[in-house]
Regions:
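Arg/Lys-rich amphipathic alpha helix in sigma70-family domain 2
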Residues: 4, 25-32, 42-63, 82, ...
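Acidic, proline/glycine-rich intrinsically disordered inter-domain spacer in sigma factors
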Residues: 66-94
């Protein structure tokens, strides 16, 4: 989560460590009837946003896309196409607004439910649904592999 927001491995590590310290200190305020994961992810996301804002970094987002089709030794053409498609997808993702990229990261990289995503990003459930829908539409328009 932190890496998706900061787009820098070192900043993401620092943000995660600081967030865990803050979570530890705030553990007494955690409501036991709420799920822990979204609460913790919200703290991490807030710390990462603070770090990114203060640093003013605008590095490119690097996502690990699943590559390969399970073949033992893909052909050079298959490998080249996979790298090209991944580069196209990364360019399309980088064109998305931060809020859209964050919601896609929660939903599809972290595999959070809509409710968990809303809690982690501290936004209403309807906002998660609309951001997800709009972000996927924008990706589909921008990323058309093979064209």
């Amino acid at each position: 989560m932190a890496y998706v927001i900061t787009r820098n491995a070192a900043d993401a590590e620092d943000a995660t460590q600081d967030a865990l310290v803050k979570a530890w200190r705030a553990l007494g305020r955690f409501r036991a009837d709420e799920p822990l994961r979204p609460w913790l992810l919200r703290i991490v996301a807030n710390e990462a946003r603070n770090r990114r804002r203060s640093a003013g970094r605008r590095e490119r987002l690097v996502l690990r896309a699943a590559e390969g089709s399970g073949e033992a030794a893909p052909s050079p053409e298959t490998t080249a196409l996979a790298h090209e498609r991944r580069a196209e997808l990364l360019r399309a993702l980088d064109e998305l607004p931060d809020a859209a990229r964050e919601v896609l990261a929660c939903r599809y990289l972290l595999e959070l439910s809509e409710e968990e995503t809303a809690a982690a990003l501290d936004v209403p459930l309807g906002t998660v649904k609309s951001r997800t829908s709009r972000a996927l539409e924008r990706l589909q328009e921008a990323y058309e592999p093979g064209t």
